[in-house]
Amino acid sequence: MDSRKKKIFLKAKIASLIAIAAPLLMWVFLLGHIPIIYKNLNLSETSWGIFLLIFGSSQILSGQIFARLITPKYGTKLMICMGVLILSISFLGIIVVNSYESFLFIAVFFGISLGLIMPSTNSHITLIEEKTNEVLQP
């Protein structure tokens, strides 16, 4: 592989890793805010479980829909940008949430945003791994 292609794949690798790291960092910050959210909304552990159920369901469904129907039409770059935008807005919403219903409603958007980001970045990483023979994702 020539140096020009190596530079392209290096830039693609960095972009994909940033696109994966940003949501994970936001998730860690959300976990740090759980005690504050519990106190403000007077929640129980079951409430957190319902949040995770809604979040996971919307992530799986949106990931399948976007990966199969919308991403091939509009491209991965747009999907990642839209996902990060929705993720940022929903993250801010989770921090300032003031009711249990809105807390659960934001879980849907949190899941949709990761459903936009993860399939696109995973396809990029798979392509990079094929071309460079590096293992980026265990």
Model-derived regions, located:
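Residue-level signature of mid-helix packing/kink "hotspots" within the transmembrane helices
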Residues: 28, 56-64
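Pair of pore-lining "gating" transmembrane helices in MFS-fold secondary transporters
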Residues: 8-33, 108-109
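Helix-to-loop junctions at the C-terminal end of transmembrane segments
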Residues: 62-75
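Structural signature of the two symmetry-related core transmembrane helices
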Residues: 78-92
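Paired small-residue
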Residues: 90, 101-109
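Helix-breaking motifs and short loop linkers at transmembrane-helix boundaries and internal kinks
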Residues: 42, 96-101
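Juxtamembrane helix-start elements in MFS-like secondary transporters
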Residues: 34, 38, 43-52, 136-137
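Intracellular juxtamembrane helix-capping segments at the cytosolic ends
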Residues: 116-130
